[in-house]
Structures are given as structure tokens and as C-alpha cells.
């Protein structure tokens, strides 16, 4: 970069001077170079990253560099398997807006854990009716004080391969979430917004419930399946779009299923049930047509149901038609799944959303390089250095299926509270024991951990500060077992020291119990004897000065 009014040579000299000054400060004040701590939520991610190569590509299990991006917004999206779209449940949140405070409690968020629970057998098949039944029958639903997380979790997420199935909902008005490129969607279900409402009367309440949308596509074709022929489903009465409850001994209801294209695997196919608006995953490898366990609330159902519902009081002689409250259906994914819409990821779909989304797992940006190559350590300079690092995306070396299976366990952190280091020695010993036991369990899943701990920590501090990649060297040296043994020995040593000190005559708890009653009356006397003469002298001097001043004034 050339500064205005200066020659390139002067600029180069100035940059060198600034660099030397910065290096001098770093060497003179080492605390300025102290590495930043690793975020706790990345602990399990790093350990899991070490186990990924051995699970899918043994050639990457050792003697290689794995680099993890520490940017909080840059993630890689891995498309979920076909079974995840049919078996992954979503949580239903009903947000109620009350206009009559004397009839209903204040606005609150109600979360249905299981609408098929025996504690509420009379709950209707429609969400709005279910909410009214809860209030009319004085049932106590689970109240979730924490609202769902709306808004994008990440904004720079990339998907390296095409997703097998996307869901698109386009409307002129709504909350835009983002659109995935058509080249990244093998097949897209287009949801058409409904134009009619279903009305149901319960007691004095009249419900206006949004009708189910339709699927606008010409690529789907009707197929014959056990689901399509009207298979009995135990949760059939819980679905919000069925006209009436259906018991197990009632005749099966015909339903039309549409087949989504799946050229990768002909033995498995994904079906869309337009009657119940569910996705079915069917395995055709056996003669019995194995059917995956279905969830009553699937991501497809959630995407179509995310809208607003209105409820009005029916006209009676004692009241006039009014609008006591409205219902807003909101859905959130569970089990570590996310909605990817464009380059942003979401856990929850807001009401009246618009865009093109798919289901993905999230993983940090991971790359690998040959262990024989030397990776330069980033230096803290005024100008960003252009580093040419031969990094290859991890998705190229690992299979997507193996990565998806491994990442489905979710991301969890192994963290130790700061208050542990302020606790007595016995609590500190117990925490070290817990850490050693945790590492022992993780060692069964991880082939090798980072051996060059000090070098990695120094590089890690700069990587977090500069928001760049952090590389860990993988080996099979057994360093973890040595550290575990040291931790256990240290915990035992601390426990013995704490026990010996507590039993010794110099322990504070042994002699303070009889010393304090003696010292409590002696301390005030000692303070009085120490400061009493000084205070008495000051008071006497003050009185003499005042008397002298009054005498002089009178004369």
C-alpha cells in the first residue's frame, strides 16, 4: 500500500520501522503476546475432528495438519441424509397475542413436548383447537420461559455439494430468509400459499385455521406405496390437516404419494404424502418394504405450517363479536439440524417466512495439508501477509456420509468453571479427577491428539486474534495417556496434602475455634490503647485552640 504524498521507498522503510517497533514491544512485554484461550465450545469439535480421518480415510489419520477456521460466521453445511427428513422431529411453539387481559393470562410462550401424551387425550387434531382445549379444561402445558432463537446463526455458510431436497416458499410479503442457488438443490418442493381457511366451532369459540398449501411441481409422479395405500398411522389424529380424528380400527384413508427423484440410490426412495403433508423414507431392499419411523411434526410440515392463525369469540346474547387473541405457529429444529437458506442458517422458522431452504448439519471450516509441509506461523504485522498454504478442504478427503454421521452427535463443549481455581484444594482435586475421567472416555473415540501443545497454543492465540486458521498436528504418541496419569497423580497429591494439612495442629480450622473467643474482646482494647492517646491529644488541642480564639476575639 502506498501512502499519499510519499514514495514507495519511504513507505517500505516506514513499514519496516513499525514492524521492528512492534516486535520490540512484543519481546519487551511478553504479556502482549500471550495466546488467547480456546473457546470452550470448540473443545469437542477439535477432538471430533481428530477422529474423522480415521473413520473415513486412514491415510489422514496421522502425519497431517488439520486446520480449523476460528471465524464465528464461516461454516460448512453438510446435507442431511434422506432418513433425517422423515425421522427428525421439530418442536412446536405457539405464541399467543391477547387482546382481552381479563379473560386470559398475559402473553406467554407455550411449548408442546408431546401432543400425543395421555395427560391430554381430548386435544383436537388442530393446533389452535388444542390450545383452546388446554385453557378450557384447565390443563397445565409446559411453559417455556426462553423464547426460540430467531434470526441467522451464521451468515457465511457454504454448501460444497448439492442438497438432495430443498423447500421453497415464495410470496410477495413475508420475512425473507434467503434463497439457495438452484444448482445446489437436486430437487425443490415449491409450496403454494393457501387462499382459504378452515372454520371450526368449539363451545363459544370459532376458529379460523389456515388451510394446507399445495405443492407446485411437474417432476413428481404418483407411486404405489404402503403409505399411499392408506397405512394405519398411530399419530393420524394428531396431524393438523386431517378433517377428523381417526382411530386404529377405522377404515384406512386413501392418500396419494409423490416420488422425489433419487438417482444416487434406487433401493431407497423419498415419498411426499400430500394428504398428511409428510415425507416418508422407504427402504426397498427387503420384501417387507421397511418404513422408517415417522415423526408427527417434520421439517416439511413445519415449513408449511409456519403462519398466523386467528381465533374469534362467537356471537352470543351476553357478548359481542371480538378478537380475544391470535396464534402464531413457530417451529424449531432439534437433534443438531439447521435450516440453510441462502448463506444463512436458522434453528427456527419465523411465521410468514419466504425463501428456499434445506436441512443441513454445520461444521467449522476444516482443511488439511500434508504433514511434511511446513506451515508458516502468522505474524502480527500492520499489513496482512499473503500466505500460500497448500490446504485442501476436508470434505474432499472425507466421505459426506461419514462426516454427516459423525456430526450428527452435535457440538458440545468441555469447560471448567473459573470458580474451580478459587475453591479449596479438595474441590480443585475433584475437578482435576473429573477432567482426567473425561479425557479417558474421549480417548476411546479419538485416535490421536495434538502432541505439540505449546507450539499449537502460541499459534492458536494469534489465530484467534487475527481470525485465521488454526492447525493441529496429528500423531499417535500416547501423550494423552501420560497427561492423564499426571493429572491423576496430581489430584492424589493435592488430596493427600489437603488431608494432611487438615489433620495437622497448624490447620486453621483446628485452633481458630478457641482463639477467636479470646481475641474478640482483646482486639477492641488493643485498638483503644493504640489510638486512644492520639485521639485524646487531638481533641484537647482542638478545644484549646477554640478557647484561645474566643478569648482573643473578646479582648
UniProtKB/Swiss-Prot annotation:
Q: What does the entry's PTM section describe? A: Specific enzymatic cleavages in vivo yield the mature SU and TM proteins.
Domain of life, per lineage? Eukaryota
Q: Please report, in chain numbering, the residue ranges of the motif CXXC.
A: 64-67
CDD domains xrefs: HTLV-1-like_HR1-HR2
PANTHER family xref list: HERV-H_2Q24.1 PROVIRUS ANCESTRAL ENV POLYPROTEIN-RELATED, VIRAL ENVELOPE PROTEIN
Q: How does it assemble?
A: The surface (SU) and transmembrane (TM) proteins form a heterodimer. SU and TM are attached by noncovalent interactions or by a labile interchain disulfide bond.
Q: What does this protein do?
A: Retroviral envelope proteins mediate receptor recognition and membrane fusion during early infection. Endogenous envelope proteins may have kept, lost or modified their original function during evolution. This endogenous envelope protein has lost its original fusogenic properties. SU mediates receptor recognition.
Protein name listed in UniProt: HERV-H_2q24.1 provirus ancestral Env polyprotein
Species name: Homo sapiens (Human)
Amino acid at each position: 500500500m502506498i501512502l499519499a504524498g510519499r514514495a514507495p521507498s519511504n513507505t517500505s522503510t516506514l513499514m519496516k520501522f513499525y514492524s521492528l517497533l512492534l516486535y520490540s514491544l512484543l519481546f519487551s512485554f511478553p504479556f502482549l503476546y500471550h495466546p488467547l484461550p480456546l473457546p470452550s465450545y470448540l473443545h469437542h469439535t477439535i477432538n471430533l475432528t481428530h477422529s474423522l480421518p480415521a473413520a473415513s480415510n486412514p491415510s489422514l489419520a496421522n502425519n497431517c495438519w488439520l486446520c480449523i477456521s476460528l471465524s464465528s460466521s464461516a461454516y460448512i453445511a453438510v446435507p442431511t441424509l434422506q432418513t433425517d427428513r422423515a425421522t427428525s422431529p421439530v418442536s412446536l411453539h405457539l405464541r399467543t397475542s391477547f387482546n382481552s387481559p381479563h379473560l386470559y393470562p398475559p402473553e406467554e410462550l407455550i411449548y408442546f413436548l408431546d401432543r400425543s401424551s395421555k395427560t391430554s387425550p381430548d386435544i383436537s387434531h388442530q393446533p389452535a383447537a388444542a390450545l383452546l382445549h388446554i385453557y378450557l379444561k384447565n390443563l397445565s402445558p409446559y411453559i417455556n420461559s426462553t423464547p426460540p432463537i430467531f434470526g441467522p446463526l451464521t451468515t457465511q455458510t457454504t454448501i460444497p455439494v448439492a442438497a438432495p431436497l430443498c423447500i421453497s416458499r415464495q410470496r410477495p410479503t413475508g420475512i425473507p430468509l434467503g434463497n439457495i442457488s438452484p444448482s445446489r438443490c437436486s430437487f425443490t418442493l415449491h409450496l403454494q400459499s393457501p387462499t382459504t381457511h378452515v372454520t371450526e366451532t368449539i363451545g363459544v369459540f370459532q376458529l379460523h385455521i389456515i388451510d394446507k398449501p399445495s405443492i407446485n411441481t411437474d417432476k413428481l409422479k404418483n407411486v404405489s406405496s404402503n403409505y399411499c395405500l392408506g397405512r394405519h398411522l398411530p399419530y393420524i389424529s394428531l396431524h393438523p390437516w386431517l378433517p377428523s380424528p381417526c382411530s386404529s380400527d377405522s377404515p384406512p384413508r386413501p392418500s396419494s404419494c409423490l416420488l422425489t427423484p433419487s438417482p444416487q440410490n434406487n433401493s431407497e426412495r423419498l415419498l411426499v404424502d400430500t394428504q398428511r403433508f409428510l415425507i416418508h423414507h422407504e427402504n426397498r431392499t427387503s420384501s417387507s418394504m421397511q418404513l422408517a419411523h415417522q415423526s408427527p411434526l417434520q421439517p416439511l410440515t413445519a415449513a408449511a405450517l409456519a403462519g398466523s392463525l386467528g381465533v374469534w369469540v362467537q356471537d352470543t346474547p351476553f357478548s359481542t363479536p371480538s378478537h380475544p387473541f391470535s396464534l402464531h405457529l413457530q417451529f424449531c429444529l432439534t437433534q443438531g439440524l439447521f435450516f440453510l437458506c441462502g448463506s444463512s442458517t436458522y434453528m427456527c422458522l419465523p411465521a410468514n417466512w419466504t425463501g428456499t431452504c434445506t436441512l443441513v448439519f454445520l461444521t467449522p471450516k476444516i482443511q488439511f495439508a500434508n504433514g511434511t509441509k511446513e506451515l508458516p506461523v502468522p505474524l502480527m504485522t500492520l499489513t496482512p501477509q499473503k500466505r500460500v498454504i497448500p490446504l485442501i478442504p476436508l470434505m474432499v478427503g472425507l466421505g459426506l456420509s461419514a462426516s454427516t454421521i459423525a456430526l450428527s452427535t452435535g457440538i458440545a463443549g468441555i469447560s471448567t468453571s473459573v470458580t474451580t481455581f478459587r475453591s479449596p484444594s479438595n474441590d480443585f482435586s475433584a475437578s482435576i479427577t473429573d477432567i482426567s475421567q473425561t479425557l479417558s472416555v474421549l480417548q476411546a473415540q479419538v485416535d490421536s491428539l495434538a502432541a505439540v501443545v505449546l507450539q499449537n497454543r502460541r499459534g492458536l492465540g494469534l489465530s484467534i486474534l487475527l481470525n485465521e486458521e488454526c492447525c493441529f498436528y496429528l500423531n499417535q504418541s500416547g501423550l494423552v495417556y501420560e497427561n492423564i496419569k499426571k493429572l491423576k497423580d496430581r489430584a492424589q497429591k493435592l488430596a493427600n496434602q489437603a488431608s494432611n494439612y487438615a489433620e495437622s495442629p497448624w490447620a486453621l480450622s483446628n485452633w481458630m475455634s478457641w482463639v477467636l473467643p479470646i481475641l474478640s474482646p482483646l482486639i477492641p482494647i488493643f485498638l483503644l490503647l493504640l489510638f486512644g492517646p492520639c485521639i485524646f491529644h487531638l481533641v484537647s488541642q482542638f478545644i484549646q485552640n477554640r478557647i484561645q480564639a474566643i478569648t482573643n476575639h473578646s479582648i
